């Protein structure tokens, strides 16, 4: 269905192609820009967690430069596509991967350890709507959102994790305008995620500056910011 009905969110090519079934964590490819996509589908709502494959494979994947972008599909009892979300690969960091308990010794694959993707932990900027309530989104808007999301790409996985965590804190503030002092209120949450860092406030300021340079927020002066 995806190959026949969905355009490439990166370059706008009208269709993407199926890949052979034996390709690990890869289901589709754009023949124009070469982008690789994985599809996970679920009847009903996605919820807060997405069941994924082997934990070790997932951790290798998010550290790879060739990891695929992820399509998440919700479908109805009669197999109608309800919603389709794209999560760009730049939003995958270790913090959103939950390790499951190994299978018991009596299981067919004893000791195998799977994982979950913590969907609720992904910032909203990393959930690009392609279909909502069976209505296809504007192609140009989808491409623009992907291009902006790509700005969050960093060479360091640790740096990316920090950037996404601070962005999530920005998103959690209900108002469009916010202050540095409001951001400091999330200090304990960030400290719990980054236990080895002992200068959280400085890190918040640093990541806010990066988010400003990348066009996600605007600095208004005197410790005041505005979401863009």
PLM regions and their residue ranges:
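Residues immediately within or flanking Cys/His clusters that coordinate Zn2+
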Residues: 5, 25-27
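Short cysteine-rich clusters marking metal-coordination/redox-active sites
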Residues: 8-11, 30-33
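Short metal-binding segments enriched for Cys and/or His
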Residues: 34-68
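Long, low-complexity, charged/polar intrinsically disordered regions in eukaryotic proteins
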Residues: 86-165
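Positively charged, polyanion-binding regions of nucleic-acid-associated proteins
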Residues: 157-177, 209
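A short acidic, leucine-rich amphipathic alpha-helix
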Residues: 182-186
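Short, positively charged loop/turn segments that connect secondary-structure elements
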Residues: 188-204
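Charged low-complexity interaction tracts in eukaryotic proteins
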Residues: 202-228
């Amino acid at each position: 269905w995806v190959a026949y009905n969905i355009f490439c969110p990166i370059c706008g090519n009208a269709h993407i192609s199926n890949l052979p079934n034996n390709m690990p964590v890869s289901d589709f490819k754009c023949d124009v820009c070469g982008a690789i996509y994985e599809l996970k589908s679920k009847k009903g709502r996605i919820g807060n967690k997405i069941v994924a494959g082997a934990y070790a494979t997932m951790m290798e994947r998010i550290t790879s430069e060739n990891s695929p972008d992820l399509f998440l599909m919700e479908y109805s009892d009669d197999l109608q596509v309800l919603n389709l979300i794209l999560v760009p690969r730049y939003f995958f960091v270790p913090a959103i991967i939950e390790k499951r308990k190994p299978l018991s010794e009596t299981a067919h694959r004893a000791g195998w350890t799977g994982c979950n993707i913590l969907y609720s932990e992904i910032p909203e900027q990393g959930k690009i709507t392609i279909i909502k309530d069976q209505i296809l989104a504007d192609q140009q808007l989808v491409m623009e959102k992907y291009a902006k999301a790509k700005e969050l790409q960093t060479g360091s996985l640790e740096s990316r994790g920090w950037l996404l965590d601070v962005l999530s804190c920005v998103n959690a503030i209900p108002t469009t305008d916010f202050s540095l002092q409001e951001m400091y209120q999330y200090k304990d949450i960030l400290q719990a995620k980054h236990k080895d860092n002992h200068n959280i406030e400085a890190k918040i300021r640093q990541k806010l500056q990066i988010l400003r340079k990348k066009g996600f927020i605007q600095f208004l002066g005197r410790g005041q910011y505005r979401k863009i």
